[in-house]
Swiss-Prot record:
Name of the protein described by the UniProt record: Dihydromethanophenazine:CoB--CoM heterodisulfide reductase subunit E
EC category name: oxidoreductase
Coiled coil (residue ranges): none
Gene this chain is encoded by: hdrE
Similarity comment text for this entry: Belongs to the HdrE family.
Subunit details: The dihydromethanophenazine:CoB--CoM heterodisulfide reductase is composed of two subunits; HdrD and HdrE.
Keyword Heme attributed: yes
Protein source organism: Methanosarcina acetivorans (strain ATCC 35395 / DSM 2834 / JCM 12185 / C2A)
């Protein structure tokens, strides 16, 4: 079995996080996320359809019943005449967001770059986790986790910049376009500001460590705490916080589109 892979995150260079510590942080974030999703499923099961709204007094929904009802709507035959096949809805309406493209190409480009960047980075993290777990179980791979992490560095850069482009467009629209600015509420600013902070902190942490572009001449000894800050805020803002914020639309909207079979 290969030697333990060193992590970039830590309080100092000598106090780097271990695999167990990262697993504990990740587990906490996932548990908080799942608890929030159960609460949302219960509210949706009670008929709540808006963000930050609560069920009527005495009304209590069931998460399991909601999921059963939703799945029943997904697989049942369309009755409104314009339902699309599930595969078409998944690819064109959810992955490529064609409904937004029909309304506004610029808004579609913004949404798609944020969605593609975010979800791909999440998937790459999942692949890294799978490789590490495979090694922990003693299964031999043709590469070490450290080598695989190095292999993922280029796609991480590419999709990080794709995400950054989308976030910058979103920020500029909210600042420059009067209609968008006037319609924005504090939750919208927290949402886009949080994604911007997560994205930039990742580039800065990597830049300090490698000395490339985003390091801004900062002392290399700050690389571990910078990486730790990025790791923690990514886990809790981009995972744990989702069910309790307007981020929930990234889950609620695809569920609704699937249930409606692509219908408006």
């Amino acid at each position: 079995m290969s030697s333990e892979m060193a992590y970039f995150s830590g309080l100092t260079d000598a106090l780097r996080l271990t695999f167990v510590q990262i697993m504990i942080l990740s587990t906490i974030a996932i548990v908080v996320f799942l608890y929030g999703m159960i609460l949302n499923f219960q509210k949706w099961g009670a008929g709540v359809t808006g963000y930050a709204l609560e069920p009527q007094a005495g009304s209590k929904g069931s998460a399991i019943r909601f999921l059963k009802t939703w799945w029943g709507q997904v697989v049942e035959e369309s009755h409104h005449g314009h339902g699309k096949p599930i595969l078409e809805v998944l690819i064109l309406d959810i992955l490529f967001q064609r409904r937004i493209l029909k309304r506004s190409p610029l808004r579609w480009f913004m949404h798609f770059t944020i969605f593609a960047g975010w979800m791909t980075l999440f998937a790459l993290s999942g692949l890294m986790f799978a490789v590490e777990m495979t090694e922990k179980f003693g299964i031999e791979l043709p590469f070490t986790p450290a080598e695989f992490r190095e292999f993922l560095s280029i796609p991480n850069y590419i999709f990080g910049y794709i995400l950054l482009i989308g976030v910058l467009i979103a920020l500029v629209r909210r600042i420059v376009v009067s209609d968008v600015r006037e319609a924005s509420i504090m939750y919208d600013w927290i949402l886009i500001g949080g994604v911007f902070l997560v994205t930039i902190s990742g580039f800065v942490a990597d830049g300090i460590r490698t000395g490339i572009i985003w390091g801004f001449g900062l002392d290399p000894t700050t690389a571990p705490p910078a990486a730790l800050f990025h790791s923690v805020i990514s886990l809790f803002f981009c995972i744990a916080y989702i069910p309790y914020s307007k981020y929930i639309h990234v889950i609620a909207t695809p569920l609704a589109i699937l249930a409606n079979k692509g219908g408006e």
